[in-house]
Protein backbone atom coordinates (compact mmCIF):
# COMPACT_ATOMS: atom_id res chain seq x y z
CA UNK A 1 0.00 0.00 0.00
CA UNK A 2 2.82 2.42 0.88
CA UNK A 3 4.45 1.68 -2.47
CA UNK A 4 1.20 2.56 -4.25
CA UNK A 5 0.94 5.88 -2.39
CA UNK A 6 4.55 6.72 -3.27
CA UNK A 7 3.91 5.92 -6.95
CA UNK A 8 0.79 8.09 -6.99
CA UNK A 9 2.68 10.97 -5.38
CA UNK A 10 5.53 10.62 -7.87
CA UNK A 11 3.02 10.60 -10.73
CA UNK A 12 1.37 13.77 -9.44
CA UNK A 13 4.75 15.41 -9.03
CA UNK A 14 5.63 14.52 -12.63
CA UNK A 15 2.32 15.87 -13.95
CA UNK A 16 2.75 19.13 -12.05
CA UNK A 17 6.23 19.43 -13.58
CA UNK A 18 4.73 19.26 -17.10
CA UNK A 19 2.82 22.49 -16.48
CA UNK A 20 6.00 24.18 -15.22
CA UNK A 21 7.86 23.55 -18.49
CA UNK A 22 7.16 26.30 -21.00
CA UNK A 23 8.02 26.42 -24.69
CA UNK A 24 7.59 29.42 -26.99
CA UNK A 25 5.58 28.91 -30.18
CA UNK A 26 7.14 28.69 -33.63
CA UNK A 27 4.96 30.52 -36.19
CA UNK A 28 4.81 29.84 -39.93
CA UNK A 29 2.54 31.77 -42.32
CA UNK A 30 2.05 30.47 -45.85
CA UNK A 31 -0.52 30.12 -48.63
CA UNK A 32 -1.77 26.80 -49.96
CA UNK A 33 -0.92 27.73 -53.57
CA UNK A 34 1.63 30.16 -55.02
CA UNK A 35 0.28 33.72 -54.72
CA UNK A 36 -1.47 35.25 -57.72
CA UNK A 37 -3.11 38.66 -57.33
CA UNK A 38 -6.89 38.45 -57.61
CA UNK A 39 -6.94 34.64 -57.49
CA UNK A 40 -8.62 32.93 -54.48
CA UNK A 41 -6.26 30.99 -52.21
CA UNK A 42 -5.98 29.78 -48.61
CA UNK A 43 -3.89 31.49 -45.93
CA UNK A 44 -2.44 29.26 -43.19
CA UNK A 45 -0.83 30.02 -39.85
CA UNK A 46 0.84 26.94 -38.39
CA UNK A 47 1.90 27.35 -34.76
CA UNK A 48 3.95 24.57 -33.17
CA UNK A 49 6.20 23.58 -30.30
CA UNK A 50 4.38 25.51 -27.57
CA UNK A 51 3.50 24.66 -23.97
CA UNK A 52 1.26 25.29 -22.04
CA UNK A 53 -1.59 24.72 -24.50
CA UNK A 54 -3.47 28.00 -23.91
CA UNK A 55 -2.84 30.19 -26.97
CA UNK A 56 -4.57 32.85 -29.08
CA UNK A 57 -3.92 32.85 -32.84
CA UNK A 58 -5.34 35.53 -35.14
CA UNK A 59 -5.01 35.87 -38.91
CA UNK A 60 -4.97 39.53 -39.92
CA UNK A 61 -5.48 41.55 -43.10
CA UNK A 62 -4.00 45.06 -42.94
CA UNK A 63 -3.94 44.81 -39.13
CA UNK A 64 -7.59 43.75 -38.79
CA UNK A 65 -8.81 40.35 -37.64
CA UNK A 66 -9.97 37.94 -40.35
CA UNK A 67 -12.61 35.27 -39.84
CA UNK A 68 -10.77 31.94 -39.74
CA UNK A 69 -11.10 28.30 -38.79
CA UNK A 70 -8.86 26.44 -36.37
CA UNK A 71 -7.96 22.77 -36.19
CA UNK A 72 -8.21 20.82 -32.96
CA UNK A 73 -5.31 21.19 -30.56
CA UNK A 74 -2.78 18.37 -31.05
CA UNK A 75 0.45 17.43 -29.33
CA UNK A 76 3.87 16.09 -30.30
CA UNK A 77 5.86 13.29 -28.64
CA UNK A 78 7.56 15.85 -26.40
CA UNK A 79 4.14 17.09 -25.16
CA UNK A 80 4.40 20.42 -26.96
CA UNK A 81 1.32 21.46 -28.90
CA UNK A 82 0.49 22.58 -32.43
CA UNK A 83 -2.45 24.21 -34.22
CA UNK A 84 -3.35 25.34 -37.72
CA UNK A 85 -5.49 28.43 -38.29
CA UNK A 86 -6.64 28.96 -41.89
CA UNK A 87 -8.98 31.02 -44.05
CA UNK A 88 -9.82 31.70 -47.67
CA UNK A 89 -8.38 34.92 -49.08
CA UNK A 90 -7.72 36.67 -52.37
CA UNK A 91 -4.32 38.36 -52.32
CA UNK A 92 -3.75 41.80 -53.84
CA UNK A 93 -0.66 43.97 -54.17
CA UNK A 94 -1.95 46.49 -51.59
CA UNK A 95 -2.98 44.10 -48.82
CA UNK A 96 -0.71 42.83 -46.04
CA UNK A 97 -1.47 39.56 -44.29
CA UNK A 98 -0.06 38.36 -40.98
CA UNK A 99 -0.57 36.00 -38.07
CA UNK A 100 -0.59 37.29 -34.49
CA UNK A 101 0.11 34.86 -31.64
CA UNK A 102 -0.42 35.50 -27.92
CA UNK A 103 1.08 32.99 -25.48
CA UNK A 104 2.25 33.07 -21.86
CA UNK A 105 5.87 32.59 -22.95
CA UNK A 106 5.81 35.78 -25.01
CA UNK A 107 6.29 39.23 -23.43
CA UNK A 108 4.29 40.73 -26.31
CA UNK A 109 2.26 39.29 -29.19
CA UNK A 110 4.34 37.69 -31.93
CA UNK A 111 3.38 38.93 -35.41
CA UNK A 112 4.64 37.08 -38.49
CA UNK A 113 3.90 38.54 -41.93
CA UNK A 114 2.97 36.41 -44.90
CA UNK A 115 5.72 36.42 -47.53
CA UNK A 116 3.99 36.01 -50.86
CA UNK A 117 7.21 34.69 -52.42
CA UNK A 118 7.42 31.66 -50.12
From Swiss-Prot:
Signal peptide: 1-20
Keywords recorded for this protein, A-Z: Disulfide bond, Immunity, Immunoglobulin domain, MHC I, Secreted, Signal
Gene Ontology molecular function, alphabetical: MHC class II protein complex binding; peptide antigen binding
CDD domains, alphabetized: IgC1_beta2m
Location of the Ig-like C1-type domain: 25-113
Keyword Disulfide bond listed: yes
Superkingdom of origin: Eukaryota
Localization annotation: Secreted
GO cellular component: extracellular region; late endosome membrane; lysosomal membrane; MHC class I protein complex; MHC class II protein complex
A Pfam family annotated for this UniProt entry: C1-set
Single GO BP term: antigen processing and presentation of peptide antigen via MHC class I
Disulphide-bonded residues: 45-99
Task performed by this protein: Component of the class I major histocompatibility complex (MHC). Involved in the presentation of peptide antigens to the immune system.
Record note on quaternary structure: Heterodimer of an alpha chain and a beta chain. Beta-2-microglobulin is the beta-chain of major histocompatibility complex class I molecules.
Family stated for the protein in its record: Belongs to the beta-2-microglobulin family.
Name of the featured protein: Beta-2-microglobulin
The species this protein was found in: Felis catus
Amino acid sequence: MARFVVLVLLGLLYLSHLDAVQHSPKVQVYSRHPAENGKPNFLNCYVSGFHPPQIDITLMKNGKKMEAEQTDLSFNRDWTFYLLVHTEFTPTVEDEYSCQVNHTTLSEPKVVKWDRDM
